[in-house]
Swiss-Prot record:
Its EC number is 1.2.1.70. This is Glutamyl-tRNA reductase. The keyword Oxidoreductase applies. Possesses an unusual extended V-shaped dimeric structure with each monomer consisting of three distinct domains arranged along a curved 'spinal' alpha-helix. The N-terminal catalytic domain specifically recognizes the glutamate moiety of the substrate. The second domain is the NADPH-binding domain, and the third C-terminal domain is responsible for dimerization. The lineage of its organism: Bacteria, Pseudomonadati, Pseudomonadota, Gammaproteobacteria, Thiotrichales.
């Protein structure tokens, strides 16, 4: 089997493209069921965040990439967006290296940001829950998690707080004076929404409104702060009227706040959702300030240098970790092949041996029976190597012939 990944991320695709190809907000079990139904797709892990959507796969034929792209394209709402214009294909070792760097935060818009590791772990867990991960892919992810833990403990790559959530709040502070007199509406109580809430509470605003599909989760988060309340998403119309700052971090398939919902009050809109939850046209209204994930990059750049010198140390750890993984995989593959070879030999010998013993018990000459037994075993054991050598010779594969000669202790010079 071959290991591949297909990805769309912020490096090549702007937010409007990433929004179209995002797989978040969809029925996860349905996604896994549909991708595993594709011929030659054996296992899969689907990762979808605000900055990237990536699919990690074990396949039996590289030609299946066309079918996977067609599968992905089927979830795009706007047919003008063609996945072939944006996706990146990685194969083999490149997949593992990328995933290690990704989990360590080296591939993030926010260098070293810690959230991505949790998102990768969540994706892995969902894959296991949907019986979509196999032994090899499981070993890859376990090594990735161990590597990320080592990088976090042995470097300071994540010590400067420049997460997307932190940067979003920094941006809001720049846009509004005296935030202690402002009402803040946060839409979404997931991992990012909770992080946003923590950063906002540190600014001590007048009031925080946290809206979520399930109010229980929002209530649990808001219970830690006096001036905060939990609401359902269905309460948005009345919450928008009260809010001075609206920040969205929620999985939706269409805009949940549009121009006609906001009136003439001046507001700051920050949307870190993928797909986008706040209509970008809100920024066209003179009284509003509107920012999306890509805009936040300007805030991030200021702090990036503080982490860059740590990234080289992280890279060295990753390279060593990858080398260790590949060495262990070679041993696993070798041991598996050796085990299979012995099982094959046992099967050949056991069948012929039983027949030979039966002949001896029936009075056949033991010497003749043993000679016949040895002849049959020789033919059976050498059958596949001989066929392979003939095929290699026909194809002009002298390298295969040399390899086979070495396997059987033959003279490679002849």
């Amino acid at each position: 089997m071959a290991l591949i990944s297909l990805a769309i991320d912020y490096k090549k695709s702007p937010i409007e493209v990433r929004s179209e190809f995002a797989l978040s907000g969809l029925d996860v079990s349905m996604l896994y069921k549909s991708i595993l139904a594709i011929d030659n797709v054996v296992h899969a892990v689907i990762l979808s965040t605000c900055n990237r959507t990536e699919v990690y796969l074990e396949i039996t034929d590289l030609r299946v990439v066309d079918d996977i792209l067609a599968w992905w394209q089927s979830y795009v709402r706007n047919p003008e967006f063609k996945i072939r214009d944006y996706f990146k294909l990685r194969q083999g070792t490149e997949v593992i290296m990328h995933l290690m760097k990704l989990a360590c935060g080296l591939e993030s818009m926010v260098l070293g940001e810690p959230q991505i590791l949790g998102q990768v772990k969540d994706s892995y867990t969902l894959s296991k829950k949907n019986h979509a991960i196999g032994k090899e892919l499981d070993r890859v992810f376990q090594k990735v998690f161990a590597t990320a833990k080592k990088v976090r403990s042995e470097t300071r790559i994540g010590h400067c707080p420049v997460s997307v959530a932190f940067s979003a709040i920094t941006l809001a502070k720049k846009q509004l004076d005296n935030i202690s007199t402002k009402n803040v509406l946060i839409i979404g109580a997931g991992q990012t929404g909770e992080l946003l809430f923590r950063h906002v509470t540190a600014l001590n605003p007048k009031h925080i409104m946290l809206a979520n599909r399930t109010i229980e989760k929002a209530e649990k988060i808001t219970s830690t702060f006096n001036n905060a309340s939990a609401y359902y998403l269905s309460d948005l119309p009345k919450l928008i009227k009260k809010a001075d700052i609206i920040i969205a971090a929620v999985n939706v398939t269409e805009y949940i706040v549009k121009c006609e919902d906001v009136g003439e009050k001046s507001r700051v809109f920050i949307d870190i959702s993928i797909p986008q939850a706040l209509d970008p046209k809100l920024g066209d209204l003179e009284q509003n300030a509107y920012y999306c994930v890509d805009d936040i990059n300007t805030v991030i750049e200021g702090n990036k240098d503080k982490r860059k010198h740590e990234s080289s140390r992280a890279q060295k750890i990753i390279v060593k970790s990858l080398e260790d993984y590949l060495e262990k995989e070679k041993a696993i593959i070798s041991n598996s092949a050796i085990k299979e070879l012995f099982q094959k030999a046992d099967g050949l010998v056991d069948l012929s041996l039983e027949k030979s013993l039966a002949k001896i018990r029936n009075g056949k000459d033991p010497e003749e029976v043993l000679k016949r037994f040895a002849y049959e075993i020789k033919k059976k054991v050498l059958h596949y190597p001989v066929v392979g050598m003939k095929e290699a010779s026909k194809q002009g594969r002298s390298d295969c012939l040399v390899c086979m000669k070495r396997m059987f202790g033959l003279n490679v010079e002849k």
